[in-house]
């Protein structure tokens, strides 16, 4: 608490207290202008954190590669050096999470949703550094994780930090700025401001308190974060790939079929994630040493995979252009799909600080392109472009697992600049959502939050017995 007070005083030291009070609130309720101004601050900071997090992860990955090529690779066998470097990087991520902020494990998005429901606390002074540096280690080791979950959680933590610095007491304002930070984080992760806004409005709809001021705050935060991202990284799309034209109307039924298949897989995939998480808990039994040893070994394994099968490692964003350029046969695509399903479950299920958006997009691309290539062979009468099915698959798997079809559609369009494919994306994503709902599947982040709350309750019940 003392450190937090020092932060507040240092920020506001040269601003008259009366001016702060007049700006932030009118009575006990913040003014609309002050909320939007704070949302702009949140978006700017979330954009900086998210953008430099991406830069930091790339720096770690490039440095790891350079070390293998030069100093360490010349002293030790290459395979051993790869295992040691990636294992050490993974250890950093697991240790920081376990020691300082257990809530920073995994994606972090369920934690923000829980905070919006006032059932999870946001220790921003711990979460931001732990997620940033822990994520650098985990993602830099080559594990199959995405950066969007960390940036959303760090963005939400930035929103809570700003409300604490400005001593905002109004619950609705604190809620709005928390959601604004999450939107800013996603906008900075994927250069996708529209998807970031819709993610809060659609995926977080059970927790989000709809009002004109809260919507405006989310929009402003996403815009500011995206401006920061583009100012630093440029205005190119995150994924470089061909620009496709809208497919023939006669082939639209294939997109519905593809969406249905993804609907089935999405339900199975979500259940497999829970099974993987429970399996890792059963393996290390919440013992710190066993947890760190398990994570370090897993990181070392992915260091080895980086040398021999790099397609099975990393978030997968870099793999997507190779897929859509037709560099792999159908059989290879299927094997890569199965392999990346396994590696995604291993990495995300282990509790490493990383997200699952990017790995899911890669999985959707793999299966979607394989489906499109197969359809092109079996239906020569139709003009089929497999790359279109790859893009549709990205949105469909996101929609089936996260249960946010509009967000998935916007995310894919913004990331690939393929605006002409909105119709097949809608058909595929809605088909996936409908099938997933019919099968009774739960949205992934609601499922993860429920599991976290359940495990916390069980630990609290066991605490008196252990103390006794």
From Swiss-Prot:
A GO cellular-component term linked to this record: plasma membrane
Catalytic activity field: 2 chloride(in) + H(+)(out) = 2 chloride(out) + H(+)(in)
Keyword DNA repair listed: no
Binding site for chloride: 107, 356-357, 445
Motif (Selectivity filter part_2): 146-150
Positions in the Periplasmic compartment: 70-76, 233-252, 310-329, 377-386
Marked site: Mediates proton transfer from the outer aqueous phase to the interior of the protein: 148
Membrane topology of this protein: Multi-pass membrane protein
Motif (Selectivity filter part_1): 106-110
Localization per record: Cell inner membrane
Highest taxon above the source species: Bacteria
Segments passing through the bilayer: 33-69, 77-100, 124-141, 148-166, 215-232, 253-281, 288-309, 330-349, 355-376, 422-438
UniProt xrefs under InterPro entries: Cl-channel_ClcA, Cl-channel_core, ClC
Record motif Selectivity filter part_3, residues: 355-359
Example GO molecular function: antiporter activity
Cytoplasmic side: 1-32, 117-123, 167-176, 202-214, 282-287, 439-468
Intramembrane portions: 109-116, 177-189, 193-201, 387-401, 402-404, 405-416, 417-421
Keywords for the protein's UniProt record, in alphabetical order: Antiport, Cell inner membrane, Cell membrane, Chloride, Ion transport, Membrane, Transmembrane, Transmembrane helix, Transport
Annotated site location: Mediates proton transfer from the protein to the inner aqueous phase: 203
Subunit text: Homodimer.
Stated role: Proton-coupled chloride transporter. Functions as antiport system and exchanges two chloride ions for 1 proton. Probably acts as an electrical shunt for an outwardly-directed proton pump that is linked to amino acid decarboxylation, as part of the extreme acid resistance (XAR) response.
Similarity remark: Belongs to the chloride channel (TC 2.A.49) family. ClcA subfamily.
Name of protein: H(+)/Cl(-) exchange transporter ClcA
